[in-house]
């Protein structure tokens, strides 16, 4: 199936990717997926069959600390067993992330030290079943290190040939600009993606999107429907306009939210998660509709004025 395409560095990928984190039961209300590994693979296969060519994962996505890398293994196995041709498989970009640590008794931390990042990237490649990772993204900054020191370590992964392209995650606009100064733009072999939180609920990333548009960097909103625990709220209460607009178009509130995200910026590539084949198909319908200016205006005006902000990021301007 042919889907609309968007630019991700040197590649053209589907305008919507698949967030694979929920398939590793990172949320307590998703534990049933662990008892159905074939069903989890079927979700990924359904996305690939539908033309999705971007799969998002991370080394920490796992049901517990001692299953570290669970999601990467799942994604790697799903791509390997997919019925698509070798050419089709080669077009799929697996984007993974590293830089967050997870240990015994669920002790979480950060490390951007070079020795840790080198081990993390090598382990991710092994779990994914690849010689070199297509897109590796720095998951979160290490608060114990100076920005420049840790980003130099990120660039070292690229220089050593362990990864093809780099991206960043949970960076502010100021930090993104510094990363571009140090590593270059997409056409210079530098930063090609930013993965930050953005959805109808979280809308405080206008300045980051501006930087992405300026330099041709893809913006991959994580939790584009508001997160695992809040996605069901899209279409109800303060977000009821998404259901109203969707009803006039014959699609769900979720599909309407995907369409809204797509029209927010030409750099946006939503990566909604799913644990059911039906959810993948529903979200993909958002790529087949074009919201009118009036509908976009209605949706924007209906959103609550106060949008929550990731407390880790610097204060940012509201949604444009």
Tell me the role of every PLM-derived stretch:
Residues 33-47, 112-127, 176-177:
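Short, acidic/polar
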Residues 141-320:
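Beta/alpha (TIM)-barrel catalytic core signal, keyed to glycine-rich beta->alpha loops juxtaposed to Asp/Glu
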Residues 125-143:
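Active-site groove signature of glycoside hydrolases
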Residues 1-92, 319-320:
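N-terminal binding-site loop/beta-alpha segment at the start of enzyme catalytic domains
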Residues 49, 78-93, 125-129, 158, ...:
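Acidic (Asp/Glu)-rich catalytic clusters
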Residues 23-38, 104-115, 139-140, 144-145:
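Active-site mouth loops of central-metabolism enzymes
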Residues 52, 130-133, 163:
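A structural motif
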Residues 24-29, 61-65, 101-107, 228-231, ...:
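A short acidic, helix-capping loop that chelates divalent metal ions and anchors anionic groups
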């Amino acid at each position: 199936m042919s889907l609309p395409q968007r630019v991700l560095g040197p590649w053209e990928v589907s305008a919507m990717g698949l967030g694979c984190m929920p398939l590793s039961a990172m949320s307590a209300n998703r534990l049933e997926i662990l008892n159905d590994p074939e069903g989890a693979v079927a979700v990924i296969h359904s996305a690939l069959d539908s033309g999705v060519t971007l799969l998002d994962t991370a080394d920490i996505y796992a049901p517990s600390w001692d299953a570290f890398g669970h999601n990467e293994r799942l994604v790697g196995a799903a791509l390997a067993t997919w019925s698509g041709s070798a050419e089709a498989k080669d077009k799929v970009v697996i984007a993974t992330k590293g830089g967050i640590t997870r240990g015994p008794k669920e002790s979480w931390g950060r490390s951007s030290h070079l020795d840790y990042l080198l081990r993390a990237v090598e382990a991710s490649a092994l779990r994914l079943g690849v010689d070199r990772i297509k897109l590796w993204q720095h998951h979160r900054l290490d608060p114990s290190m100076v920005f420049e020191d840790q980003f130099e370590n990120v660039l070292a992964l690229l220089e050593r040939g362990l990864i093809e392209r780099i991206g960043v995650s949970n960076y502010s606009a100021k930090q993104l600009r510094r990363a571009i100064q140090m590593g270059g733009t997409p056409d210079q072999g530098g930063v090609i993606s930013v993965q930050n939180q953005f959805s109808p609920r979280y809308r405080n990333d206008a300045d980051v999107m501006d930087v992405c548009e300026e330099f041709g960097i893809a913006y991959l909103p994580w939790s584009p429907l508001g997160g695992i625990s809040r996605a069901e709220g899209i279409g109800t209460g303060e977000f009821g306009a998404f259901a109203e607009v969707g009803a006039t178009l014959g699609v769900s509130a979720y599909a309407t939210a995907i369409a809204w995200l797509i029209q927010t910026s030409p750099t946006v590539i939503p990566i909604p998660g799913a644990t059911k084949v039906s959810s993948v198909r529903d979200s993909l319908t958002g790529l087949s509709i074009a919201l009118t200016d009036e509908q976009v205006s209605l949706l924007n005006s209906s959103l609550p004025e106060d949008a929550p902000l990731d407390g880790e990021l610097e204060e940012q301007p509201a949604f444009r």
